[in-house]
Amino acid sequence: MEEEKRWIAVPTWRIPERLERWHSLIKYLKYKTKDLQKVCYVPHFKVGWAWWTCSRVIFPLQEGSHLEVQGYWHLTPERGWLSTYAVRITWYSRNFWTDVTPDYADILLHSTYFPCFTAGEVRRAIRGEQLLSCCKFPRAHRYQVPSLQYLALKVVSDVRSQGENPTWKQWRRDNRRGLRMAKQNSRGDKQRGSKPPTKGADFPGLAKVLGILA
């Protein structure tokens, strides 16, 4: 008797055709700015047997855990939806793994990648001095309860950005630059021969880059 086919259902986030933008941003931050130097990017031709997987991006985290963003294509071929894309976001620890939402994935990433306000900035803000660091992943703080220090530094940075300090005005443009950088690099190899984008762009976050309504 023929064995009945078994299906495994996993939660995925259906996305528009933005995987090339995602791949481009990851490669830029890995090979150009070195912000994601420890990240492992696996393209579709190295995935192996999983023909529906178009890419795997593995982010090593603290205490031996890691976050994996797996992109899927050729979903539901029986209906002809070959252009349908989706991603699965999974967090792995030593003895446990679970699927996570994009907002929580951003929090996990910010615990290891992209600098935030340093402890010395609080003392500089109290003394009225110029702040020397800035949070490069502000979207990761969106869905968590921020500390009083972070809120105070955000207020100080926003107020000073409206004044005469051009540095803070430039930092506020970094998030938009990160998205624009991904769009430019995803146009193809011809764009790679042009002048590279400005370094120091903020990381826009998983949901923003992939177009996920999180």
Curated annotation (Swiss-Prot):
Upregulating conditions: Expressed late during infection in a Rev-dependent manner.
Coiled-coil residues: none
Positions of region (Multimerization): 154-166
Disordered as annotated region, ranges: 179-204
Keywords: Host cell membrane, Host cytoplasm, Host membrane, Host-virus interaction, Membrane, Phosphoprotein, Ubl conjugation, Ubl conjugation pathway, Virion
Main location group: host cell
Entry domain remark: The BC-like-box motif mediates the interaction with elongin BC complex. The HCCH motif (H-x(5)-C-x(18)-C-x(5)-H) mediates the interaction with CUL5.
Function of the molecule: Counteracts the innate antiviral activity of APOBEC3G. Forms a complex with host APOBEC3G thus preventing the entry of this lethally hypermutating enzyme into progeny virions. Functions as an adapter molecule, recruiting APOBEC3G to the ubiquitin-proteasome machinery. Targets APOBEC3G for degradation through the assembly with elongin BC complex, CUL5 and RBX1. Binds viral RNA and affects the stability of viral nucleoprotein core. May play a role in viral morphology.
The protein's name in its UniProt record: Virion infectivity factor
Organism: Simian immunodeficiency virus (isolate Mm251)
Gene behind the chain: vif
